[in-house]
Amino acid sequence: ISEFDRVVGGGLVKDSVTILTSPPGGGKSTLALTISNAAAKLGLNVLYASGEESESQIKSRADRILNDIHSNVWLMADNSMDNVITAADKTNADLVIVDSIQTFALSEFLPARAGNPTQTMECAGELVRIAKGGVKPVAVIIIGQMNKSDELAGLRSLEHLADTDLIIDG
């Protein structure tokens, strides 16, 4: 975590949005869980929402890499951005991690499916609003999938919504 903190200039900042990408298998989810646990140990409330894995899969990964997940980390397996927004409020989250943005959808934009450019941009926009426009500032990490050209899958404009774009290069 100290290396991550160094790369982002001293650690995550509340009211900031960070996009984290890598090729498949590059360690995005593992790094995000590690960040979650480290933040929770500092007393922060963390919401980790996965649209790709079940809660038991997330817990299994956390047990494998961390031995145990801190009680201040709330794990959520759901691809509804509406539910993520509600959970962020209910858990009084200081840090929200969404893994990965291309798997989430807002009900307002259905029947457009998760991964559709409109859904991806609108979901990211909601996360920016959580970070910067809520009652309290929140740090947000958006995990993004890369395409075969090693670019962030979806719209390039997604990168412009973030304060920091990080690419894990294998």
Q: Each PLM stretch: what is its role?
A:
Residues 104-108, 112, 146-153:
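Short, solvent-exposed loop/turn segments at secondary-structure junctions
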Residues 1, 5, 14, 29, ...:
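Amphipathic alpha-helical transducer elements in NTP-driven molecular machines
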Residues 1-69, 85, 89:
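The Walker A/P-loop phosphate-binding site
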Residues 88-98:
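Proline-aspartate-enriched helix->loop->beta-strand connector
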Residues 23-25, 51-54, 79-81, 100-103, ...:
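Short, ordered loop/turn segments at secondary-structure junctions
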Residues 121, 125-170:
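Phosphate-binding/switch region of NTP-binding enzymes
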Residues 21-24, 69-78, 105-121:
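Flexible beta-alpha connector loops of hexameric P-loop NTPases
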Residues 48-50, 75, 96-98, 137-145:
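Structural recognition of the conserved hydrophobic beta-strand(s) that form the central parallel beta-sheet
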